[in-house]
């Protein structure tokens, strides 16, 4: 974490310790486009990261170690390096595998505030200690995309609101996977005015009730795409209720890779968001078309389920783009392939997708513009 290009400028005196007899932990490609650092050595040469200052994409893993030793540089004012930071090419930054004091993370964000960074990924991090007091105005980067995977925070569910205060407005894509807490105190959360894509996939313990707690009412007014793959969703009606409570109007909803149950006959009917046009229910274990789906759906993916018959036209009156591949009524061997992807030498589409989901833990979601200034 500490070796991001910006913080290097803050901590340069303590980092210039070059060892000629050790393998470089950082590698920069021939085009000076991508730089990857993996500090797994017991005594890492942090200064190797200096070469990453010319790259557009930077990925840094701290080898699972604590970065508390660098706290002494966290109070350095990055303004003195503003011109140098602005000149850096980096647009995408990934930081991972470290125990990071919250004070140090904030110092990095303050330095990044002078950069042209657009996409930030935090992965396998343990953020420790209290977060510094909220600034009078956001001093961090103007991100378009923020992705977090397996990041824990001492502050519990308050982490998103605290992190949000250090980011400039304008975030359009937010991905949160393997979160330790998604029960956000809504009073401490500011409105995500520009957020169009929210991906809460790969949070299998979330469930319908957890979604209700995560989607704070009126905080996502511009939301267009909501992804809930492998998020422990239980029924379409439960998801519908959470969307209604949050007063969001997504145009596209992904509920694939959840074991969905059919809504109970006596359940209260839910009114889906009127803007919803596309719904992904693939890999949901469905044996029949769920009742009470959004009435204005035009795109529906029911592939790789357990449907024994083709849906009737009156069940899906407005759908003109329907995907049914991998269901038993089309392929008698579909169930066997879903249960055992390696049953034959040729891996069918449904099995390939399931294997990909298992290996990656998530399908990368990058909706919205990738225009870098």
Swiss-Prot record:
Entry comment describing in which tissues the protein is expressed: Detected in lung. Detected in brain and kidney. Detected in trachea and bone marrow.
Keyword Secreted in annotation: yes
Assigned keywords, A-Z: Cell membrane, Disulfide bond, Glycoprotein, Golgi apparatus, GPI-anchor, Immunity, Inflammatory response, Innate immunity, Leucine-rich repeat, Lipoprotein, Membrane, Repeat, Secreted, Signal
Biological process (GO), any one: positive regulation of type II interferon production
LRR repeats, residue ranges: 55-81, 82-117, 118-143, 144-171, 172-195, 196-223, 224-250, 251-276, 277-297, 298-319, 320-347
InterPro entries in alphabetical order: Leu-rich_rpt, LRR_dom_sf, Monocyte_diff_Ag_CD14
Topology relative to the membrane: Lipid-anchor; GPI-anchor
GO cellular component: external side of plasma membrane; extracellular region; Golgi apparatus; lipopolysaccharide receptor complex; membrane raft
Record: glycosylation sites: 38, 150, 280
Location relative to the cell: Cell membrane; Secreted; Membrane raft; Golgi apparatus
Major location (coarse): membrane
Cystines in this chain: 26-37, 35-52, 186-216, 240-270
Signal sequence, renumbered to the chain: 1-20
Job of this protein: Coreceptor for bacterial lipopolysaccharide. In concert with LBP, binds to monomeric lipopolysaccharide and delivers it to the LY96/TLR4 complex, thereby mediating the innate immune response to bacterial lipopolysaccharide (LPS). Acts via MyD88, TIRAP and TRAF6, leading to NF-kappa-B activation, cytokine secretion and the inflammatory response.
Assembly and binders: Belongs to the lipopolysaccharide (LPS) receptor, a multi-protein complex containing at least CD14, LY96 and TLR4. Interacts with LPS-bound LPB. Interacts with LPAR1. Interacts with the TLR2:TLR6 or TLR2:TLR1 heterodimers; upon interaction with ligands such as diacylated lipopeptides and triacylated lipopeptides, respectively. Interacts with MYO18A. Interacts with FSTL1.
Protein name, per record: Monocyte differentiation antigen CD14
């Amino acid at each position: 974490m500490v070796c991001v290009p910006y913080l290097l400028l803050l901590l340069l005196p303590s980092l210039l310790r070059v060892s000629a007899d050790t393998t470089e932990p950082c590698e920069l490609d021939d085009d000076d486009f991508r730089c990857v650092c993996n500090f797994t050595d017991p005594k890492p040469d942090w200064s190797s990261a200096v070469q990453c200052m010319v790259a557009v994409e930077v990925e840094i893993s701290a080898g699972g170690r604590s970065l508390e030793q660098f706290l002494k540089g966290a109070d350095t004012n990055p303004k003195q390096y503003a011109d140098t930071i602005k000149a850096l090419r980096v647009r995408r930054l990934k930081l991972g595998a470290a125990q990071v004091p919250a004070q140090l993370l904030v110092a990095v964000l303050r330095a990044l505030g002078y950069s042209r960074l657009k996409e930030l990924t935090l992965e396998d991090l343990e953020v420790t200690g209290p977060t510094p007091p909220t600034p009078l105005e956001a001093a961090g980067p103007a991100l378009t995309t923020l992705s977090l995977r397996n990041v824990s925070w001492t502050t519990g569910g308050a982490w998103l609101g605290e992190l949000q205060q250090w980011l400039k407005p304008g975030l359009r894509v937010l991905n949160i996977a393997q979160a330790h807490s998604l029960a956000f105190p809504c009073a401490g959360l500011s409105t995500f005015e520009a957020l169009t894509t929210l991906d809460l996939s790969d949070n299998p313990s979330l469930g319908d009730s957890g979604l209700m707690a995560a989607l704070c009412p009126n905080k996502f007014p511009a939301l267009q795409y909501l992804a809930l793959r492998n998020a422990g969703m239980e029924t379409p009606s439960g998801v519908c209720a959470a969307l209604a409570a949050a007063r969001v109007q997504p145009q596209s909803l992904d509920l694939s890779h959840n074991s969905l149950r059919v809504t109970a006959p006596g359940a209260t009917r839910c009114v889906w968001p009127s803007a919803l046009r596309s719904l992904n229910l693939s890999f949901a274990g469905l044996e029949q078309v769920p009742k009470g789906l959004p009435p204005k759906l035009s795109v529906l993916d029911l592939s790789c389920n357990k449907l024994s018959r083709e849906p009737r036209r009156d069940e899906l009156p407005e759908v003109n783009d329907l995907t049914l591949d991998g269901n038993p009524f089309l392929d008698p061997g579909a169930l066997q392939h879903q249960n055992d992807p390696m049953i034959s030498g040729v891996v069918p589409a449904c099995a390939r997708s399931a294997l990909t989901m298992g290996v990656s833990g998530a399908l990368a979601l990058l909706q919205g513009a990738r225009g870098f200034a």
